[in-house]
Amino acid sequence: AQYRIGDADLNSLQYNIIRSHSCGAGEALPDICVRAAMLARLQTFLNAKSGVHPDVVRILADFLNNEIYPLVPRHGSVGASGDLLQLAHIALALIGEAEVSFRGETVPAAEAMAACGITPLRLRIRDGLALTNGTAVMTGIGLVNLAQARRLLGWAVKASVMLNEIVESYDDFMAGALNEYKLHAGQIEIARQMRAICATSRRLRKREAELYSGDTGAAPTFRHKVQPYYSLRCIPQILGPVLETISQAEKILVEEFNAVDDNPVVDPAAGTIYHGGNFHGDYVSLEMDKLKIAVTKMTMLAERQLNYLFHDRINETLPPFVNLGKLGLNYGLQAAQLSLIHISEPTRRTPIS
């Protein structure tokens, strides 16, 4: 940061920045993550605070529209200086010097560009640094993670309702008033979603009809458990915080996606160039740490619910391990539970790794 570069070398510097930083390691990121990263970088440039040539914007759009995705190694970024290495691999493809994923195959970038009538980018002053400096990769991956987490949450809510229907639980655990007493918006919303899903269900029991009608009989025990197991009854309290975590992550990631995450930042209106740290990735990384914990909570809930479903002495409804064949001869889903435990255990042990 102390060396003065002569005007004659400024364009060469842009190429050197990209080539020297294209040294990531590991497997390539999925195409969807690379696409999200490229879109995030394009959005940054559209803020017109990076000082790049319009050709940079055009070629990023051309790559996206033609579904050309640079091969980007997954290891190398630490976030403190943005996604330098991963973004350099994207930039290397834009100048036609890398491999890309194109139409289901890995081909040289120049070959894919020629097939689509795209001319390799000629770098000008500022272009190389702007292409490599920012949080586009972590933001793009974060948005993909967010979409998947929202999908998982939707499945978790539906599966929880179905499980309660299978064992004919009482429905008051999802009552509007009960969950509003807790005040948390996420819990209230999950309970509302559950009520909407089972609005026409005939499988759930009404507590007032069975316990408060005065017709409970003289037996020492009730026919059905007064309070179902936690994995059935505490769904709003478990998935409510998950929903709020996802919503907060979405807020931060959308802000980051639309932000100017470059450095330096060029402000033509003020006639000023700011040197700062907008490339720093803590906003995204902290939200991803929290999102991983939330996803772990969903896996733990699913494992406990399946454990309940598989054990006839607990659910008092289904055969052991949902074995619909001949006991002893058939095994049902017994082995599946072992697989579930194995899959969920690492996430419980290291939920933010």
Regions found by a protein language model. Name each.
Residues 2-35:
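Residues that scaffold, gate, or flank divalent-cation-dependent active/transport sites
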Residues 22-184:
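Active-site cavity-forming subdomains of large catalytic enzyme subunits
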Residues 88-90, 296-340:
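Small-residue-enriched alpha-helical segments and adjacent helix-cap loops
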Residues 164-300:
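Accessory "access/gating" subregions that flank catalytic or transport cores
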Residues 8-12, 32, 51-58, 82-85, ...:
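Conserved active-site and cofactor/substrate-binding residues in soluble primary-metabolism enzymes
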Residues 341-345, 349-353:
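Single conserved hydrophobic/aromatic residue that forms the stacking wall/gate
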Residues 140, 176-180, 234, 275-276, ...:
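Short beta-alpha connecting loops at secondary-structure transitions
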